[in-house]
Structures are given as structure tokens and as C-alpha cells.
């Protein structure tokens, strides 16, 4: 029963390069107040793509209180039949009213991180919508790259056609021309693939961090991915070369020029460019809006910046510990409490709407000393100060805005009235002879979780008598490392049998909003890539377009055209493309963002300013890219231009 298997990583931490088999170590379980000595029986190989996340595997102890169970089933397994069988056999459940939930590993992987009985804490999970957004954005980036390639191919096709026609005159067969076109395209794609591998090697750690992934470079050469990459390389090589070979071989000499410089080519290039600009505008627009939602999240979490929470559930040492650390200059302020900030006390509250239908709410309850509100930076909107409340009432309670909105009749002042006047369930819990809880004031809402959920109605009790279980400490930013070292040293001196642990409240709050953070970072990454690809494509297109119009520019300058007029002539087509792309991208992106923002109870509004800024950014990148070539052409001596023609 005391045998344990360690992962390679954990075994190296415990025993270094020594053979860990047969060695022992002790683990102290704080909550059970129990110490168990384990003997290492095996070392497990690391599997980065495993759905399980663990450092050790051990048998259950006598104090095991249940939890998720993994079932290995065959192909004939039917979940509905199995569920009904459990009901028919009356398999015991919690209090006789519980229920068994069944999920496949795929469903568990994409399950929301909510701490319910059916939530499995020890498996890796990811966000389905984040993966879809990432996949869709990657496809859009690939489309931009393909459009770039198509546009640049069209831009240099005249030179290719002249060369191929010369080869045909010299006796080259259709097969030889096709092989040459394929080889040219294939080498371009292959070189691009190897360059992409180098970029992937550099950016993969950042990508894994953004999406909480565990992808290694070897994954791209696995049986899952390598066939897809090979198929993509071949498709990008064969399809363009086949099209060009067929088209060129079917054209007569008189049709070459109209094919390469005619209206049809201009229409294709214009269409591809407009779609490319539309994708870039959409990604930038989405990025700016998601970034605003992330800023709203960060603003609500600022009150937790440099705030840590230290717990002692035995309650024997927290008072002594707090008195000792209070004198440290690296600590800004601190308070004692009986409940955590992120993981606080909860109870169910049932209310009725106008039609008599029952509405279930979760009520949060905090208990802290007289400095609790100050340390948490919670403003009192109405009522008494903490000091006055503790003087006037034995059990002062502050309700938050959400509580007042749900339970206090509109226009009524609840300050000075018993809590049980508004919350009947609360009244049932109050014991006879104990002081009555009186509402001392209304405080602003405290956001402790994701902005996708409505803030909990809450009660905050103030007390100046022990016992306390936690201390919340706000550190001075410039002395954070020093403060943490002092806190650990003090803890180990006062409570040597319990490891020093703390919870960073800001990190925990941002972790609960991880979906928004990862989406924002992912979109920022894709937006930058799309703008870079667009700029690269424009650079080549502008260079070719100006080369084609060298004679025209020279004649216009001889006839008195100014540099500004030449710049406008060369740039107006690109400006028009951006304008059309803006008109296409904005309605679609606006609608998509509106649907996404509906997932948030507290959200930003999509603004016209953000919309215009996204178009302005793409237009600026376009003009900066194109204008370099345009300015050189506009400022060139027309005599030299005409001589070269």
C-alpha cells in the first residue's frame, strides 16, 4: 500500500542521478494531519501528449473520500443503458439524492474548469473555442500566404511566359515545360517549409505558453501530422503548376499578352488583394476588441496586485505569525480573516421572481477583521466606516451592490437593519442568544472569478476576535522578493512542521479569466503575422506594378506631373482595395465579436473608434510598404526612365 511510482522528472528532483528504486521518502498531508512514508517501486516515462497530469502514482489511503473513477470499456458500451442499469441496481449515491455523471476523455478534455463533483482535476484540458479560433485564424493566415503567392506569380508571369514561349520555339515539349514549372514551384514551397521549421523552433515555446499547450517539434514529424504536411506541400506545388502549365500551353502567341496584362488578370489580382486586406482588417479589429475586454478584466483584478494569502487551517499560529510580520517595512498592509478571497464560503439562496418562480443564487460570505475592507480596497458606498460599525454593532455586516439589488426593495435604506429582514434563510441559521447581524453599509462588488459569470451577492462580516485561519498580506512591489523571503523565514520559525505556502490572489484571479487572456494573445500573434505577410506581398506587387508603368510615369513627368500626383496615381489602387476590404470585413467581424461578447456578463462595447483604427492600421501598413517604391519612381529622372524603356 505504501509503494509509489514517480515520473522521471519527479524522481530526478528527489534523488538526482541516483537509482530511485527501493528508496523511501515521507509526505505530510496537511489537511489529514498524517505523514506517510512511501517506497519508490517504479519510474514512469514522461509522455508530453498524455491527458493525465501527475508527478506520482500511489494507492488510495484509508482516508480516501471518493472522487472520479476511470472506466475502460469496449466498443459495445452504451452510456444510456449503463446509466439506467446503475439506477435500476440502486448503486449508492451521496445522501441518496446524488447522481453519477459519465464523460468520455474527449468531453473531459474540453470540460469547463468548474469545481464540481464531476470535474476531474488531474487531467490536461483545453478550450474548444480557443482551438477553433486558432485553427480558423491559421487557415486565414494560410489563405493570405496563398493569395500572396498567387499575386506574386501573376506579377512575374509575363517574364515566365516569354521564357516558356522561347523554350517552345526551341523545341521544348509540353511535359518538359510542366516539369520545369512544377520544379520551380516545388522548390519555392520546400524552401518555405524549411524556413517555417526554423521559425517554429523559435516560436513554439511562446505558442505553448499562449495556448497552454505541450507541443514539441517532434510532434510535426509524427504519424498524425507528417502526412498532412507532405500532402499540403504537394498540393501547393502541383495545383499552381498544373494550372499554369495547362493555361500557357493552351494559349497562342497572340493571347499571351492579353492573358498576362489584360482585364481578367487585374480582376483576379484585385479580388485576391481585397480578400487579403479584409482578413487583416478582421484580425486586427478582433484583436483590438478582445484586448479591450482583457483590459477590463485586468482593471477588475488590479485590487489584487501584490496581494498574497497565507492559510493555517489549524488556527494555532496565524495570530502569532501576523503579529510578527506586521513590523516588516516591506509589507504595505495586512488583515486577518476566516475565509479566503478567491475560495470563500458559499451557500445557496433561493429567491422568487414576480411570477413566483424560484431563482437559485450562490451567496458569498467573507469574515475579516476591521482592516479587511481596506486591505481588499473595497469602497464603502453607503453606511458606517469599519471602526464605527464595530463600535455600534456586535456583528456588523456589509452587503455588496449585487445583494442590495436582489434583496433590498428599491428606494429602501437597509443600513442599521437586521440581515434576516431581507434574507429569511439567514434568519434560520442565527442561533438564539447570539448577537443579531446588522447591516452596517453597502460596499462595491468584489469580482473574484471570470467576467463571464454574474458577481455573487455577498455578505462581509467584521470581527475583532479570534480565531482566524488566514492572513492577507499586501506586499510593496519594489520589495516583493525580500518580503516573501522574510515571510517564509518567519513561518518556518513559528510553524516549522507545516511547509510555507501562499496564494497569489492576482494570479488566481487572472487564471480564472485564462480563456480571455489566451484568446487575446493568440489573436495578437495572428494579427502581427497577417500584417507582416500582407506587407511582404504588397512589397513585391508594388515593385512589379511600378516596373510595368515605368514608361507611363516618365511620360507623365515630362508632361508636368508632380511627385505628389505620381504618388497618388500609384497608391490610389491600393487605397481603394483597403476601402472595399474594410466595407466587407467590418460587418462580418462586428457580428462575430458581438456573439462572442454575449458570453460575458460584464463586457466592453464594440466602438466605432476601434473599427476605424483597425482599418487605419492596415491602411498605414499598406501605404508605408507601397510608398517606398512609389516615391522612388516619382522622384526618378524621367529621361533615365524613358531611356531604359
Feature-to-residue mapping (PLM):
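Hydrophobic alpha-helical transmembrane segments that constitute the membrane-spanning cores
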Residues: 187-204, 208, 529, 576-593
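Hydrophobic alpha-helical transmembrane segments of multi-pass inner-membrane transport and secretion
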Residues: 126-162, 189-190, 194-195, 267-291, ...
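Hydrophobic alpha-helical transmembrane segments of polytopic membrane proteins
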Residues: 225-244, 529, 535, 610-632
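Alpha-helical transmembrane segments of integral membrane proteins
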Residues: 120-123, 153-179, 183-186, 190, ...
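C-terminal transmembrane helical bundles of large multi-pass transporters
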Residues: 497-583, 593-596, 635
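Interfacial "coupling" helices/loops that link adjacent transmembrane helices in transporter permeases
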Residues: 145-186, 537-575, 636-637
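Membrane-helix entry/capping segments
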Residues: 89-138, 159, 173-174, 203-231, ...
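Mid-to-C-terminal secondary-structure elements
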Residues: 2-126, 323-511
Amino acid at each position: 500500500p505504501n509503494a509509489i511510482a514517480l515520473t522521471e522528472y519527479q524522481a530526478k528532483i528527489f534523488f538526482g542521478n541516483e537509482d530511485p528504486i527501493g528508496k523511501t521518502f515521507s509526505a505530510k498531508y496537511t489537511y489529514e494531519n498524517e505523514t506517510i512514508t512511501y517506497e519508490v517501486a517504479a519510474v514512469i516515462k514522461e509522455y508530453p501528449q498524455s491527458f493525465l497530469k501527475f508527478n506520482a502514482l500511489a494507492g488510495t489511503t484509508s482516508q480516501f473520500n471518493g472522487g472520479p473513477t476511470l472506466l475502460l470499456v469496449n466498443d459495445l458500451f452504451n452510456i444510456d443503458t449503463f446509466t439506467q442499469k446503475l439506477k435500476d441496481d440502486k448503486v449508492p449515491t451521496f445522501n441518496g439524492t446524488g447522481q453519477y455523471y459519465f464523460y468520455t476523455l474527449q468531453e473531459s478534455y474540453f470540460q469547463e474548469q468548474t469545481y464540481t463533483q464531476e470535474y476531474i482535476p488531474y487531467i490536461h484540458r483545453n478550450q474548444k473555442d480557443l482551438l477553433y479560433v486558432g485553427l480558423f485564424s491559421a487557415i486565414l493566415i494560410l489563405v493570405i500566404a496563398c493569395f500572396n503567392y498567387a499575386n506574386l506569380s501573376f506579377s512575374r508571369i509575363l517574364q515566365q511566359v516569354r521564357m516558356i514561349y522561347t523554350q517552345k520555339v526551341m523545341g521544348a515539349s509540353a511535359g518538359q515545360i510542366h516539369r520545369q514549372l512544377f520544379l520551380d514551384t516545388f522548390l519555392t514551397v520546400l524552401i518555405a517549409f524549411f524556413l517555417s521549421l526554423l521559425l517554429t523552433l523559435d516560436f513554439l515555446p511562446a505558442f505553448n505558453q499562449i495556448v497552454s499547450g505541450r507541443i514539441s517539434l517532434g510532434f510535426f514529424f509524427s504519424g498524425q501530422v507528417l502526412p498532412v504536411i507532405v500532402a499540403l506541400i504537394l498540393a501547393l506545388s502541383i495545383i499552381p503548376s498544373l494550372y499554369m502549365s495547362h493555361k500557357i500551353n493552351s494559349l497562342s502567341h497572340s493571347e499571351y499578352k492579353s492573358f498576362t496584362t489584360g482585364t481578367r488578370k487585374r480582376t483576379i489580382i484585385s479580388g485576391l488583394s481585397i480578400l487579403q486586406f479584409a482578413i487583416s482588417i478582421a484580425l486586427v479589429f478582433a484583436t483590438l476588441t478582445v484586448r479591450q475586454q482583457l483590459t477590463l478584466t485586468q482593471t477588475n483584478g488590479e485590487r489584487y496586485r501584490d496581494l498574497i494569502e497565507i492559510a493555517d487551517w489549524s488556527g494555532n499560529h496565524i495570530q502569532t505569525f501576523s503579529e510578527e510580520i506586521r513590523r516588516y517595512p516591506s509589507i504595505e498592509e495586512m488583515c486577518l480573516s476566516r475565509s479566503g478571497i478567491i475560495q470563500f464560503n458559499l451557500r445557496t439562496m433561493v429567491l422568487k421572481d414576480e411570477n413566483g418562480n424560484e431563482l437559485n443564487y450562490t451567496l458569498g460570505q467573507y469574515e475579516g477583521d476591521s482592516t479587511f475592507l481596506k486591505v481588499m480596497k473595497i469602497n464603502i458606498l453607503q453606511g458606517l466606516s469599519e471602526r464605527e460599525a464595530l463600535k455600534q454593532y456586535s456583528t456588523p455586516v456589509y452587503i455588496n451592490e449585487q445583494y442590495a439589488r436582489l434583496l433590498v426593495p428599491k428606494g429602501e435604506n437597509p443600513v442599521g437593519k437586521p440581515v434576516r429582514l431581507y434574507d429569511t434563510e439567514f434568519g434560520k441559521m442565527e442561533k438564539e442568544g447570539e448577537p443579531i447581524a446588522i447591516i452596517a453599509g453597502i460596499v462595491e462588488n468584489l469580482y473574484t472569478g471570470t467576467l463571464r459569470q454574474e458577481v455573487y451577492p455577498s455578505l462581509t462580516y467584521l470581527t475583532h476576535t479570534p480565531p482566524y485561519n488566514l492572513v492577507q498580506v499586501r506586499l510593496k512591489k519594489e520589495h516583493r522578493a525580500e518580503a516573501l523571503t522574510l515571510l517564509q523565514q518567519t513561518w518556518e520559525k513559528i510553524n516549522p512542521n507545516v511547509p510555507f505556502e501562499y496564494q497569489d490572489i492576482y494570479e488566481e484571479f487572472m487564471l480564472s479569466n485564462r480563456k480571455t487572456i489566451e484568446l487575446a494573445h493568440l489573436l495578437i500573434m495572428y494579427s502581427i503575422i497577417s500584417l507582416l505577410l500582407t506587407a511582404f506581398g504588397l512589397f513585391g506587387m508594388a515593385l512589379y506594378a511600378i516596373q510595368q508603368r515605368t514608361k507611363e510615369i516618365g511620360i507623365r513627368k515630362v508632361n508636368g506631373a508632380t511627385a505628389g500626383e505620381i504618388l497618388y496615381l500609384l497608391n490610389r489602387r491600393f487605397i481603394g482595395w483597403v476601402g472595399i476590404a474594410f466595407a466587407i470585413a467590418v460587418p462580418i467581424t462586428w457580428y462575430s465579436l458581438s456573439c462572442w461578447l454575449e458570453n460575458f456578463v460584464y463586457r466592453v462595447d464594440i466602438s466605432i473608434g476601434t473599427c476605424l483604427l483597425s482599418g487605419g492600421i492596415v491602411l498605414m501598413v499598406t501605404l508605408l510598404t507601397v510608398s517606398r517604391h512609389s516615391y522612388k519612381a516619382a522622384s526618378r529622372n524621367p529621361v533615365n526612365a524613358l531611356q531604359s524603356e
